[in-house]
């Protein structure tokens, strides 16, 4: 149920060390005006819907099915929210969930930890975030990573930032990686040309030489906080960066920060975990991107909805949705912690959808 795509030996060692461990799930929420560009994302059918995606996802993951949610899960063009996958796992396995607000236009409707960030401006401006905010969020990441690190367990770090694969492409490009054509998106056919055009607009604004400045120019508030959290937590325990393109971008950011400022990091303790729909997406090149960045193993759950009774789940097999809010990482955790099979995962997710339909 778990496949290792890169850095095989390091990935195997990580999995062996964390068998039967109950993790903590940190869900980091942020916002970028890049996500409001028409056609940039399917994580919300319209730009207006996308303003509430992160808030609605967090409410559902923490509270589960409710007849009257404050923020209902936004309608998707096709498919079901990955929040169903994440919620099914954390609910059934009683995994603790902490929600962090790195920079949202509205506060979450659940208990959360305020980080003092801000929503990002569109990366095409070349001034997405104030540099003081970027450095503050990194310091917060270091603090919380140290607080949540567990020697006998691990920390899953997931995110929700609509438009985040575009900011990921931007910071990868800003850090010197030739990532165009390799990233993924929520579209069944990745919108590479649109993403690259936006990134080029942002990069045209100024020359950038420092990783903090790359985030300030082109990033979103989640990225720098997660980088700090992973660096600090790796010193004591395991870290599972739960996501595809976005977490590979964070891994590149960590490497840049460590190279520039010599922050102590234990590379043996960090992996990137996603879904097979991201890792094997033929409209991107996730594995090639992971190899280009190096250092961290790329793993993916082999979760498969081919036999699901719900068309909204079968849509994942056609390339829709793919990943989000730590879904792949949580599915990996279910296999590690309780040895869940594909049947176990699908049943838990379908039960949740059935409950929602009857609510």
UniProtKB/Swiss-Prot annotation:
Membrane-spanning segments: none
Signal sequence residues: none
Pfam families assigned: DBI_PRT
GO MF annotations in UniProt: nicotinate-nucleotide-dimethylbenzimidazole phosphoribosyltransferase activity
Alphabetical list of CDD domains matching this protein: DMB-PRT_CobT
Superkingdom of origin organism: Bacteria
Family the UniProt entry places it in: Belongs to the UPF0284 family.
NCBIfam families: nicotinate mononucleotide-dependent phosphoribosyltransferase CobT, PRK04447.1-5, PRK04447.1-6
Protein name, entry field: UPF0284 protein MAE_56900
């Amino acid at each position: 149920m778990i496949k290792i795509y890169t850095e095989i030996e390091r990935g195997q060692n990580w999995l062996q060390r964390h068998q039967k461990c109950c993790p903590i799930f940190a869900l980091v929420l942020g916002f970028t005006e890049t996500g409001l560009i028409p056609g940039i994302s399917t994580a919300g059918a319209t730009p207006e819907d996308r303003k509430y995606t992160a808030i609605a996802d967090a409410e559902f993951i923490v509270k589960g099915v409710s007849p009257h949610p404050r923020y209902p899960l936004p309608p998707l063009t096709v498919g079901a929210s990955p929040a169903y996958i994440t919620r099914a796992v954390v609910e059934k396995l009683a995994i603790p969930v902490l929600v962090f607000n790195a920079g949202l236009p509205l506060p979450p409707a659940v208990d959360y930890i305020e980080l003092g960030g801000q929503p990002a401006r569109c990366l095409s401006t070349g001034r997405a975030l104030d540099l003081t905010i970027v450095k503050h969020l990194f310091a917060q990441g270091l603090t919380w990573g140290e607080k949540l690190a567990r020697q006998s367990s691990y920390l899953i770090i997931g995110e929700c930032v609509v438009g985040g694969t575009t900011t990921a492409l931007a910071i990868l490009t800003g850090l010197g990686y030739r990532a165009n054509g390799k990233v993924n998106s929520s579209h069944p056919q990745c919108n590479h040309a649109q993403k690259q055009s936006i990134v080029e607009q942002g990069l045209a604004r100024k020359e950038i030489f420092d990783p903090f400045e790359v985030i300030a120019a082109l990033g979103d508030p989640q990225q720098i906080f997660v980088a700090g959290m992973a660096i600090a937590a790796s010193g004591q325990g395991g870290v599972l960066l739960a996501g595809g393109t976005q977490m590979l971008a964070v891994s590149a950011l960590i490497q840049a920060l460590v190279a520039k400022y010599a922050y102590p990091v234990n590379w043996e303790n960090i992996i990137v975990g996603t879904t097979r729909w991201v890792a094997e997406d033929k409209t991107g090149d996730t594995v090639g991107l992971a190899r280009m960045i190096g250092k961290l193993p790329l793993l993916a759950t082999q979760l498969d909805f081919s036999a699901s009774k719900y068309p909204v789940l079968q849509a994942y097999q056609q390339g829709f949705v793919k990943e989000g809010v730590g879904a792949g990482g949580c599915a990996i955790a279910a296999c590690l912690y309780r040895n869940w099979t594909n049947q176990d995962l699908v049943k838990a997710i379908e039960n949740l959808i059935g409950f929602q339909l009857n609510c």
